[in-house]
Amino acid sequence: MAETKPTYYITTPIYYPSGKLHIGNSYTTIACDTLARYKRAMGYDVYFLTGTDEHGLKIEEKAEKLNTDPKSYVDGMAKQIKDLWQLLEISNDKFIRTTDDYHERAVQEIFDRLLKNGDIYLGEYEGWYSVDDEEYFTETQLAEVFRDDNGKVIGGKAPSGHEVELVKEQSYFFKMSKYADWLLDYYQSHPDFIEPANRMTEMINNFIKPGLEDLAVSRTSFTWGVPVKSDPKHVVYVWIDALTNYITALGYATGDSEDLFNKFWPADVQMVGKEIVRFHTIYWPIILHALGLPLPKKVFGHGWLLMKDGKMSKSKGNVIYPETLVERYGLDALRYYLVKAMPYGNDGLFTPEDFVARVNYDLANDLGNLLNRTIAMINKYEDGQLPAFKAGVTEFDADLEATAATTIKNFNACMDSLHLSDALAEVWKLVSRTNKYIDETAPWQLAKSDDANDADKLASVMAHLAASLRVIASLISPVMTHAPKEIFTQLGLDPATLAIADLQLADLPAGAQVVAKGTPIFPRVDMDAEVEFLKGKMTKSDKQKGRKAMENAKHEAEVEQGWNPAETNLNLTKPAITIDDFDKVELKVAEVITVQKLKGADKLLQFRLDAGDADHRQILSGIAKWYPEPEELIGKKVIIVGNLKPRKLRGEMSQGMLLSAEHDGQVQLITVPDNMVNGSLIS
């Protein structure tokens, strides 16, 4: 009978597809992916869930603004998020969308069960509602209150800074207040349920002790949601619709098999940002308890990845997107940085200077140079073959061996306790100790000696270096998906043998042939140039720096001798313009999200495009004649005129223009390589 593996179920929050995800959003998914990969390497049967929360008024309004329907809008956004996770090599087992049929069926069933059990009742709600936050607030909870001349409250701002509006409507309520004492008792008997511990203290003091209010769980003021089965004019609100995804994804209440639910629930770790800890540690546990289900073993609320001027915000112009960093520095650099930059439970800080420093110092210098030196010395001193590992041959071996053993032990402890940044710090202690070991043993001196003992020492040093790199590569493999395999390959080891379980320094396969010449796995970058590049990506006012640099280069360049451009016939078809005229035009890279023929206009195609803006934009183009199957354009990267004044065509708004080329009556869209980042400026 086959041995049953222990199970491990880990979830990210499901992401609200109202805009493009930045590196702060991506952290949660990369952190969960790191844990999922680690647990798989340790022999667990892992189920890793992520997805999108696709209902609500905000989505309905976004779609209306873009002249599309909500389903088409979220289809495009879900594809964009899936594409990002693929770029980041996220190893999720399932991607749930709250618009999936099985989820909607389950939500209706769950709502119906709670209603029949008496935990949900019909009432009327009046309060200040923030569309962006999808949350109601009392007047005392508002960060700012607006009053008329008579002192009457007429509006205000939520703690997030988003404006609120007064909403009064019939609503179904969940009896949250009924379970306050039970939840407090549960916290006290399960002190590890919420981590870090200060989050639990915050929940108790700020929300439970002041008194839990019953929770509105349906809406009638919009239609984009799951209808209540017994009362279809109501749609199920986010608290039941979104939170239950963690169990419906496993088959609970779907009417299908619940084998996955029985196998993996309760979740081992549910990782969320600190801003939604309340929903996952108050609303979610109470809903589960009312359904008679066990609670997740742990909810971990991580901090925010901040900029120097606070949270990332498109309005501040301080947002940076993962695609930019992956394209320029590689995926491993981004994954390493995000995991390293976020200390346990606290906020992390992103600065261009720190990011580039980590690429150069941690990756290129410390790890990359260690590999390069080791490969070069094994080729030079051992004919490219890994010597057999022997313990304690030199006076420095024992300390390196002890450091490796401690690193493995501490790394595993950090990973198991969700101290991911500390886990990497432990590995870099071994990286540092191994670099020091080279200086201590001075292999170049041992190689000059005629003493046979020194030859044995030299072989031992080479074996220890290779063995240490093998351990380092194995430990970082949950975080970095490329470098560990490359380290193994350069050492002549099979990347398929990368493993963390039962890892030991001494288990180095002898006789493997290293590569004849090592290749840098993390090339050094120019510090000043890269900091300037990143600042340009983060700051609105710096967007034209690249173009200005190009123009400066043109002015400084000397004309090639022997050729007079003034004599060239330019064959102009339109009046000449100056560079200042051209500089007024904003050309941007955009990705085609959806495209279809415009109803009632056979010549026009209706494009929805991601041009790196906060929202998608719509452009109408008269190229339908040349693209009889326009769906083939979905996913293509095109060039648009981004600052063309919007105009209406056939009753639809067109927010720009697509660039195309025409020859002999044939028209073709101009496309660019897929690896170009959406929103990149064309100069």
UniProtKB/Swiss-Prot annotation:
Gene field: metG
Reaction catalysed by this enzyme: tRNA(Met) + L-methionine + ATP = L-methionyl-tRNA(Met) + AMP + diphosphate
SUPFAM superfamilies linked to this entry: Anticodon-binding domain of a subclass of class I aminoacyl-tRNA synthetases, Nucleic acid-binding proteins, Nucleotidylyl transferase
GO BP terms in the entry: methionyl-tRNA aminoacylation
S-S bonds: none
Pfam family of the protein (one): Anticodon_3
Motif ('HIGH' region): 15-25
Function: Is required not only for elongation of protein synthesis but also for the initiation of all mRNA translation through initiator tRNA(fMet) aminoacylation.
Binding residues for ATP: 314
Protein name, UniProt field: Methionine--tRNA ligase
Gene3D superfamilies assigned to the protein according to its UniProt record, in alphabetical order: 2.170.220.10, HUPs, Isoleucyl-tRNA Synthetase, Domain 1, Nucleic acid-binding proteins
Major localization class: cytoplasm
GO cellular component term, pick one: cytoplasm
Subunit record text: Homodimer.
